[in-house]
Amino acid sequence: MIMTVSDPGGSSMSSSSAITPESEQAMAAVNDAPVGGQLLQQRLALVEDLWQTVLRSECPAEQAERLLRMKQLSDPVLPEGNAVSSDALVSLIRDMDLSEAIAAARAFSLYFQLVNILEQRIEEDGYLESIVRSQDTAEQINPFTPPLATQTEPATFRELFERLRRLNVPPAQLETLLQELDIRLVFTAHPTEIVRHTVRHKQRRVASLLQQLEAQTESSTFEAGTIRLQLEEEIRLWWRTDELHQFKPSVLDEVDYALHYFQQVLFDAMPQLRRRLSSALASSYPDVQLPPSSFCTFGSWVGSDRDGNPSVTTDITWRTACYQRQLMLERYVSAVQGLRDQLSISMQWSQVSAPLLESLEMDRLRFPEVYEERATRYRLEPYRLKLSFVLERLRLTQIRNQQLAEAGWRAPADGLLSSNPEAPQSESLHYGSVAEFRSDLELIRTSLVSTDLTCEPLDTLLTQVHIFGFSLAGLDIRQESTRHSDALDEVSRYLNPDQAYGDLNEQERVQWLLQELQTRRPLIPPSVSWSPTTEETVDVFRTLHRLQDEFGSRICRTYVISMSHSVSDLLEVLLLSKEAGLVEPSAGHADLLVVPLFETVEDLQRAPEVMEELFQTPLYRNLLPRVGSQGQPLQELMLGYSDSNKDSGFLSSNWEIHKAQIALQDLAARNGVALRLFHGRGGSVGRGGGPAYQAILAQPSGTLQGRIKITEQGEVLASKYSLPELALYNLETVSTAVVQNSLVTNQLDATPSWNDLMARLARCSRRHYRALVHDNPDLVAFFEQVTPIEEISKLQISSRPARRKTGTRDLSSLRAIPWVFGWTQSRFLLPSWFGVGTALHEELVNDPDQMSLLRTLHQRWPFFRMLISKVEMTLSKVDLDLARHYVTSLGSADHRQAFDGIYTTIAEEYSLTHRLVLEITGQERLLDADPALQLSVDLRNRTIVPLGFLQVALLRRLRDQNRQPPMSESPSDGDGRTYSRSELLRGALLTINGIAAGMRNTG
């Protein structure tokens, strides 16, 4: 037997891990919810039945029964309704060998992923019900309900516009905002996206079959039975599929994964979003003009984010752009073929506009082969003939795009297409820009409208072209600030060793950079051989120039500077851009938007000072793009949630970001600059995650003004965009929240006493957090030993290393994502709440009457309510008894006393935070205000416990072997087998997969 699950310290599972009857109350509350209730219980029962059926068919009988018994013992509410001690569960796990442990890890992982599919279906139902409800009850909407403080359901466009109408928001004010509405969602490759693309495909198949099964009526017994068999078959195939990545994904693998959501969901979802907005606007504000189709667009870091990822090269970024264009061209070809089939209009029965006929004559001269092939067939069908020419141009554009992908960014553009013997000699025959393609489609639409005809598929395609263009999503380049200063230092040392850039102070650097920006001569000699890092840094800007020449400026116009500290960080990028021809300071022209990313608390505090100096610098200000009807200069600025949280803790990080937004918006307004804030939010609360709707509504009043940019990280892509209705749910809630925040003003952020209170809480929380995380010399060892952080690094889930190359293994080298991942696996979830309890407690010790103010803040201030809501949700997922098991089982003997002290500190802080959150919210249990979420967390918390025991046992055995000589492996605990390190590692990694699925987020 390999399992040793008894606590070496003598503790056993109790208190928070005990099965409690309160879950029955949660289930009863869910029964009364609009969506859920009996349907929820039926769906849970179906998932349970499918899971049990598959286990019984795929596992040996005795093993299957033990796995089912494990699940039964971990259920919050057993069929007989009795609370059960965890002793029986411990005993059951202790008797397992490695093969059974692996089967258990896989079984529970499968269970959680099935439950995740179920919850996605429930979210879809909730969204669809909200649409129906908003149509039926618009007249009952109370505009004076304080939506910014208390609304928990995402608003639909219909609900939003009706509320605005009743609040007497003038149509002109709404129209002005809608015309300048600018929502950008940026997909990133998340290192903790743990599920294989193959498994995601099976999940979508299961979700589709579940939806089909629910659609069956009582009379369709045969069809329902057939679908049920298909479900069992699909899940059995899933069971026999390896959950673990067998190799580290390449960057292009990650690109393919991200593009899937555009291909399968978003390409078709975006026109639906616009139609819903149009319908809702017509109902409440019929005279208000629709926003441009591109009011909501997408960006991507996948294939372009090179911060700490040496695998992202200039060639990779170039190929990524080609891949994205190829995907769009394929979708456009399919759409145009559909239009050609549909638009069978004959000139015998309908007139055609003169411009369309003239364009056909031009096309005949340019494409004689196409005309000869199609003219007879479509002699009297001008739309079909025109679309045949459009298809030919798309085909030639595809050929050119493929050649570009193969040739690379350094290849000359001239002659690429003509080198293909199948292509015409004239390069201009392909679409040189998306504007040419759009012009052809508009020509067809105008002709149809002139004869009183409409074509919804054509309108849909035009919307898609406006949103996606040929590039699909703009690629943001991201690079760490020191890469630019190091490159300029190397260049300057070559040119003048006595005045090296790296030896200058900040003021001297700014002076030198401004001087170089204003001179017309090049700085970087073209024939010098630089170091590989400098060559790559400089080549990025050359690649950008070539990308924009070939694909248009839309493909890659944003350059994000991570770890921005100073004015020189931005001017360095402008100078390197000037060298590549992207910036012409003398002409006040720039084809690149330079975006500082302020990440640490100190940098967030310094950000207004940095931007003030830049806004007061004429050269910099003149290079900003102009937006809006007033032609204001636009500055995009990114706020980092991850590193500021890791640096200072949850409460301090959120408060500093909140303050920075207000200060930066005030600064921008004083300088006549439009500000677009870019929120670098992760999937977990510890990295800025949580419900987007509440998060946007909680932004300081006046900081959005219709503009926002948000990262959508790989871990959450599946939960938001895997299904069409889920995608629409997310897109509509984000859009309505931005409009609502921008128009419904909230002056509570400016309440002095509230701000003073938050400042005190943030300072105290930061002090307590840093005392544990940064000042305790044993914390690094604690984290490395009592969490599976080392094993997490063995997961083949990302092209980016888990640590920065700093030469050390301290916390500064560890990225924020695995930092959160490790704490989540061991059920501490420390980054998302630690320090909050002490801050609240000290405030109340100094003045007990402050509890009344804290409750007022929770009821009325969206920002504070969001903070407490996130802390509450995180606390509900913490399991300190299980976490204690990690400490006592995995901590080394020589650290026992120190680790016990750290655990005690964490446990005391948890108890304090838990108690005070309940006092502030006025609840008896965490999440009482959200019974559906409470039930979901209860179900998951208890069912994850067996995986925690399994993980600890496997980690303990694996680490024991790692401490032995390579050829010396002890037999397992009495079962006569010797397990290799790779076998034990595989088992441990499977438990990581399972717990990640159960927690629904990782890092």
From Swiss-Prot:
Pfam families for the chain: PEPcase
Q: Which residues form the active site?
A: 190, 646
- Spell out the Gene3D superfamilies in the cross-references: Phosphoenolpyruvate/pyruvate domain (1.20.1440.90)
GO CC terms, sorted: cytosol
- GO MF, any single term: phosphoenolpyruvate carboxylase activity
- InterPro entries tied to this protein: PEP_COase, PEP_COase_bac/pln-type, PEP_COase_Lys_AS, PEPCASE_His_AS, Pyrv/PenolPyrv_kinase-like_dom
Enumerate the residue ranges of region (Disordered). Answer: 1-24
Could you tell me the EC number(s) of this protein?
Answer: 4.1.1.31
Which biological process annotations from GO are given for this protein? carbon fixation; oxaloacetate metabolic process; tricarboxylic acid cycle
Co-factor requirement: Mg(2+)
Name the reaction it catalyses: oxaloacetate + phosphate = phosphoenolpyruvate + hydrogencarbonate
Q: What keyword terms does UniProt attach to this protein?
A: Carbon dioxide fixation, Lyase, Magnesium
The UniProt entry, under NCBIfam families, shows:
PRK00009.1 (NF000584)
The role this protein plays is: Forms oxaloacetate, a four-carbon dicarboxylic acid source for the tricarboxylic acid cycle.
PANTHER family referenced in this protein's UniProt entry, alphabetically: PHOSPHOENOLPYRUVATE CARBOXYLASE (PTHR30523:SF6)
Looking up HAMAP family in the UniProt record yields: PEPcase_type1
For this chain, the family text in UniProt reads: Belongs to the PEPCase type 1 family.
Q: What is this protein called?
A: Phosphoenolpyruvate carboxylase
Organism, as annotated: Synechococcus sp. (strain WH7803)
Q: Which gene encodes it?
A: ppc
